[in-house]
């Protein structure tokens, strides 16, 4: 803790120079201050107003209906991560101004109630409100962005952005969404909003020439990297062990267990086995159960506040929230969303895509993941370095929060050579979301400070 505070003091001295020899620089924005701050705001004030993440944790991600959380209710999943972010920072829960939870499948009023229950399970008092947000697969990231925006607006000082999904408890409709407005059939774009996600994956593969081999290779790499991350033990930094139970489906006997490892990863995944799988959504297509994300159970939570408050409390800073963007794309190829959202988010942060050191891009389907990476000409050694949703799983509402925890802990491990990171995902009905983060301790002696090449205007 003392070392973290000393690092912050070092940066403060750089941002608030007293030597007259530096007077010519006093009107220039700090390299680490928000790129769009107005001229009246001093670098010192802008620095203190940064929205920072002081804790980000997740549960393990488990196979729906077959994995370690198959008999764990969503409010119990959420409670575990809500409790972790306050206990591990020694924060008084009553100081939290709001808890925003991303969640997708469950009926809205039911899940809102469950999230309030989870807050009580985690020890939060009556005074702390809770709400849910649903922007499909970006819901967890949207929750974090909503909290960051509310803190910046002055609505409250401390907030938690979280996500939860129990796809064991709540199921995606197998036959599509019922009760849609019949008028949608008269509007092609509206009709395309109702397409099964797997068909949109096939559309991306066909329109942009993503081959079955490319998709299977991406799947193998995802499992390989996830297995290596688990074997190394590095994911213990971000995963909260959850004490729960599993129920034998035949005898109904209950067994107490502790879940702390992602259980959908297949270390022996290989091209030969994947090539044997039949396509799922279209005859002679290319999307299979092996190169698409898994349905999963899990939760994540992210604790945010202003940098000035974090420093006052002596909390080490894990990351800085720099920008967030959501963009619309054609519903029939919704998976291309990251290819549009990532440049939008980096531009808002005053950066170019080439300035980003690490990416977490949700692998909803290998087709759209491969396309997005190729379109942006990304260095694949910087993308999903610990595996992605094909291997780990995709609990819809929790994925955004899971990615924040994974990205920021990996950036911390990499140190001074990893300053900026991006999280992105596609969104059903045709959207993409992306956020830019800066490593929290990137101010160590300003050893890695560099001028961003992007246009900040």
From Swiss-Prot:
Catalyzed reactions per annotation: an acyl-CoA + acetyl-CoA = a 3-oxoacyl-CoA + CoA
Domain of life according to the entry: Eukaryota
PROSITE patterns per record: THIOLASE_1, THIOLASE_2, THIOLASE_3
Record's subcellular location: Peroxisome
EC number: 2.3.1.16
Record's note on what induces expression: Induced by jasmonic acid (JA) and systemically by wounding. Slightly induced by dehydration.
Tissues where the protein occurs: Expressed in seedlings and wounded leaves.
Coiled coil regions in record: none
Active-site feature positions: 137 (acyl-thioester intermediate), 394 (proton acceptor), 426 (proton acceptor)
Alphabetical keyword list: Acyltransferase, Fatty acid biosynthesis, Fatty acid metabolism, Lipid biosynthesis, Lipid metabolism, Oxylipin biosynthesis, Peroxisome, Transferase, Transit peptide
SUPFAM superfamilies in alphabetical order: Thiolase-like (SSF53901)
Assembly and interaction partners: Homodimer.
Function description: Probably involved in long chain fatty-acid beta-oxidation prior to gluconeogenesis during germination and subsequent seedling growth. Involved in systemic jasmonic acid (JA) biosynthesis after wounding and may be during senescence.
NCBIfam families documented for this protein: AcCoA-C-Actrans (TIGR01930)
Family recorded in the similarity comment: Belongs to the thiolase-like superfamily. Thiolase family.
Official protein name in the record: 3-ketoacyl-CoA thiolase 5, peroxisomal
């Amino acid at each position: 803790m003392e070392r973290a505070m000393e690092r912050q003091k070092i940066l403060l001295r750089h941002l608030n120079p007293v030597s007259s020899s530096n007077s010519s620089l006093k009107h220039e924005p700090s390299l680490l201050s928000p790129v769009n701050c107005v001229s009246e705001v001093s670098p010192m004030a802008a620095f203190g107003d940064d929205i920072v993440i002081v804790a980000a944790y997740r549960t393990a991600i488990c196979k729906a209906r077959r994995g370690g959380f198959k008999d764990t209710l969503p409010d119990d999943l959420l409670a575990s991560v809500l409790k972790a972010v306050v206990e591990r920072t020694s924060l008084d829960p009553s100081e939290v101004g709001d808890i925003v939870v991303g969640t997708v499948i469950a009926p809205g009023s039911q899940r809102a109630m469950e999230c309030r229950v989870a807050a009580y399970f985690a020890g939060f008092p009556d005074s702390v409100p809770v709400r849910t947000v649903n922007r499909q697969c970006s819901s967890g990231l949207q929750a974090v962005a909503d909290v960051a925006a509310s803190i910046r607006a002055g609505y409250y000082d401390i907030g938690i952005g979280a996500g939860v999904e129990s796809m064991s408890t709540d199921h995606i409709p197998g036959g599509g969404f019922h009760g849609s407005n019949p008028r949608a059939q008269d509007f092609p774009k509206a009709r395309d909003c109702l397409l099964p996600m797997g068909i949109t994956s096939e559309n991306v593969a066909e329109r942009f020439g993503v081959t079955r081999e490319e998709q299977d290779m991406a799947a193998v790499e995802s499992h390989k990297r996830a297995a290596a991350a688990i074997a190394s033990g590095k994911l213990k930094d971000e995963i909260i062990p959850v004490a729960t139970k599993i129920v034998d489906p035949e005898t109904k006997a209950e067994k107490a267990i502790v879940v702390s490892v992602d259980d959908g990863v297949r270390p022996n995944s290989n091209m030969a086995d994947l090539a044997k799988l039949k396509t799922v959504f279209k005859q002679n297509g290319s999307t299979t159960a092996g190169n698409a994300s898994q349905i999963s159970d899990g939760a994540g939570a992210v604790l945010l506040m202003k940098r000035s408050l974090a420093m006052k409390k002596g909390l080490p800073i894990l990351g800085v929230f720099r920008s967030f963007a959501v963009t619309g794309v054609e519903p029939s190829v919704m998976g291309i969303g990251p290819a549009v959202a990532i440049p939008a988010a980096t531009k808002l942060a005053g950066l170019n895509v080439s300035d980003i050191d690490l990416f977490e891009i949700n692998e909803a389907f290998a087709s759209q993941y491969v396309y997005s990476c190729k379109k942006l000409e990304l260095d694949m050694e910087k993308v999903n370095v610990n595996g992605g949703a094909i291997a780990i799983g995709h609990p819809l509402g929790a994925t955004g929060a899971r990615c924040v925890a994974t990205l920021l802990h990996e950036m911390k491990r990499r140190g001074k050579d990893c300053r900026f990171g991006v999280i992105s995902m596609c969104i059903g009905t045709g959207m993409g979301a992306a956020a830019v983060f800066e490593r929290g301790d990137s101010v160590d002696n300003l050893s890695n400070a560099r001028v961003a090449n992007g246009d900040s205007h």
